[in-house]
Curated annotation (Swiss-Prot):
Signal peptide: none annotated. This is Achromobactin transport system permease protein CbrC. It comes from Dickeya dadantii (strain 3937). GO terms for molecular function: transmembrane transporter activity. It is a multi-pass membrane protein.
Amino acid sequence: MDKRGGMDHVLVWRQGRFSRQINLTTVGRVSLALLLVLAVMVASLGVGKLMLSPWEVLRALWSSQPEGAALIVQQLRLPRVVLAALVGGALAVSGLILQAMIRNPLASPDILGITSGASAAAVFYLSFLAATLGAHYLPLAAMIGAATAALAVYWLAWQAGVSPQRLVLTGVGVSALLMAATTFMLVFSPLTTTLSAYVWLTGSVYGASWRETRELGGWLLLIAPWLVLLARQVRVQQLDDGLAQGIGVRVQWLRVALLLLSVALAGAAIAWGGAMAFVGLIAPHIAKRLVAPGFAGQAAMAFLSGAGLVMVADLCGRTLFLPLDLPAGIFVSALGAPFFLYLLIKQRH
């Protein structure tokens, strides 16, 4: 092992012919972000109609008797907070992959039609199938919609390969078409269905249970090995296609693999948390500003940033307008829309 100086402290680990660099500055900042996210989680568990101090929250978490404060924390608040963190983290990493793959800082699941596809499928399910099959299959319908939309965008953008620019333009067009279809279905749906759909379309973790949290957590654990496997390839996508092909990279196959990985992350997050816009745009930019280039460190920071963002948004929705419980997506959009305009202005200059 040896250390290298510079702006960032880097630890180089060597074993035989293999070596690996560990950016100590990145590790430190990710660790600090993790502590901040845990602090937000404790605060979220303590705030509500029944106010609890941090020490009372910790006692409730460790209590083996699910009654009183322990029942509220363990069965009502904790599943919701954990689901919010998983949804935000998955959307953030999905956005990070897309921004690297398309080489566009404005890329996100919203731009490529992933969110619109999930939304259209979810509204279709609520309007025509939920009465027969029940609401349990809504996440599956949303994931199928997200995957179908993404594959349609890729197929329509194909022209002897897919360029990042064509992918974005096609994604915007498909998103607009799917949003129109979603609105059309909402107009002709019963009022109760429309109200349920609007809450889902805004993005909310209201009424989250341990079943939903386990389902999303299990799905993300299945995706994690593929994320690790493709981590080193993400930076290759940031190169010019000709240069990447020159060093032996199968650019189009890699682009398909990364797109499917991004869809798997975003589709699952949207399926269980609703169409929460802008998380996949904001969190990757926070990560890029805080840690050095390198997908592993940026992915960890993006996950924590997205988790914290959605948890804070959900906390605001639960507490700022009591007794109303507003969808977290409202507060994420309130922050994300100005940030998107800022990026547009920055890109122009």
